[in-house]
Amino acid sequence: MAAKQTEPVTIISLRKLSQAAPEPQQKETKTFTVEDAVETIGFGRFHIALFLIMGSTGVVEAMEIMLIAVVSPVIRCEWQLENWQVAFVTTMVFFGYMVSSILFGLLADRYGRWKILLLSFLWGAYFSLLTSFSPSYIWFVFLRTMVGCGVSGHAQGLIIKTEFLPTKYRGYMLPLSQVFWLAGSLLIISMASVVIPTIGWRWLIRIASIPGIILIMAFKFIPESARFNVSTGNTQAALNTLESIAKMNRSVMPEGQLVEPILEKRGRFADLLDSKYLRTTLQIWIIWLGISFAYYGVILASAELLERDLVCGSKSESEPEVVETTGDSGEGLSPCYCHIFAPSDYRTMIISTLGEIALNPLNILGINFLGRRLSLSITMGCTALFFLLLNICTSSAGLIGFLFMLRALVAANFNTIYIYTAEVYPTPMRAIGMGTSGSLCRIGAMVAPFISQVLMSASFLGALCLFSSVCVVCAISAFTLPIETKGRALQQIK
C-alpha cells in the first residue's frame, strides 16, 4: 500500500489558513441607564434619609401656609380689617407662590433641583422672620407675599425624592409624605394655642421660622438628582452619586458603563403644550386648580366657621361681643370682631387636621391597585359630596366629623396629583411641569379665601355649591386623563 504523502507546511499555507479562520468578535460593552441603576440598587438607608430630610420640607411649607389661618383673627382685630382684607392676605401669599413656581421650575430644569430648593428655603426663612416685624397691614401683606415666593420652590424636594425612588416604592413612599404636612399643620396650630395668648402672634412667626433654618443645614447630606445630571451631560457626577447610594445601601451597581440620553433643550414651557402632552397638561392644570381651590377652601372655611359660627346661621354661646374701636382718624367707630380662638376652637382644628392622615392607607392602596386616575376620580367625587353635607344643620360633633372627612379627602387628592404629575413628564421637563402646575393651582388658592371668608358670610349654600361643582369637574378630568402612570418607569427623554 502506498504511503499517503503529506504536504509541507509553508508560510503560504499558514496565511491561507489564517484567512479562512473566522475573526473573533469583539465583546459589546455593557451599558446601563440611571433608571437601571436606581432599580438595581433598590431601596435602602439612603432612601430613608432622603425621605426624612426631603419630607421635612412639607413640615416647613405647612407651617408657613397654615400660619395665616391661625393668625387671621388676631390681625383682623389689631388692624381693624374687613373680611376682604383678611382674605387678601392669603390671596397675595398664593400670588407670590404662583409667580415664583414657574420661575423656580425653569431654573430647576436648567441649574438643578438641589440649588433651587436651597435658594427657596433661604428666601422663605429670611422673609418669614421679617414678617414678624411688620409695622402695618401693608407691610404684612408684602412680606407674606415674599414668603409665598420662597415656599413655591419647596416642590423640588418632591421631585428629588421621586427621581431617586425605585418604581415599585414610589406609590407607597410618596403618599407617606403627607405625614410631614400633617405634622407641620398640627405643630403650628398647637404652637398658636400657646404662643398667641401669651407672647403674641409676632413671636409665633419667629418660632415658626426655626424648622426651616435647621433644615437648610441638613440639605448638605442630599445629592443633586442623578437623572438631572445625566440629562445635562454630567455623567460622571451622576455615576459618583449612584455609587455613593449603592455603598450606603450596601448594594451593587449594574455592570457596564452609564450612558446618557440624547441631549435636548430643557425646561421649555412649549414642551408642555406639545401634541404628545397637550391634553395631559391641560387636564392636569384643571385638576391642580380645583384641588387647591377645594383644599384651601376647607382650611379657611374651617377657621371661618369657628370664628363666626356660620353653620345654620346660628350663634354659639361662646361668641364674643362686637368690640367697637376708634379709628386713627377719629371720625367714628369701626367694628372689629375680636374673636381670638378659644382652646376648644384649637382642638376642633387639630381634630379636623388629623383627618389628613385618616385616608392615607386607603389612598396608598387605591393608587397602587386602582391606579392614579381612578383613585383620584373617586376621592374628588367624594369631596364634592361632603362639601354639600356641610349645609346640614348638625351638632358640633357632626361638624367636626364632616370637616374631618373633608380634610382627609382633599389631602388624598393632593397626594395623588403630586405623584401623577411627577411621574407623567420626562426628566427634561419634569420640574417645569411641576412648577407650572403648582403655579396655576395657586389661582384656585387665591380665589378660595374670597369664597370661604367673604361669599360664605353672604351665602353659605352658594359657597358650598361652588366648591362642590369644581370638585365634580376635577373628578371627570381625572377619570379621562390619557396616561396611567401606575407601574410605569420614569421617562428620561421626551
Curated annotation (Swiss-Prot):
Q: Give any Gene Ontology cellular component.
A: membrane
Would the keyword Repeat be found if you checked this record's keyword annotation? no
Among InterPro entries, the record links this protein to:
MFS_dom, MFS_sugar_transport-like, MFS_trans_sf
User: Disulfide pairs?
Assistant: none
The record's subcellular locations are: Membrane
TM region(s), chain numbering: 48-68, 86-106, 121-141, 179-199, 203-223, 281-301, 350-370, 385-405, 431-451, 460-480
- GO function terms (MF aspect): transmembrane transporter activity
This protein's record includes keyword Membrane: yes
- What is the designated name of this protein? Putative transporter SVOPL
From what organism does this protein derive?
Answer: Mus musculus
Q: Which gene encodes it?
A: Svopl
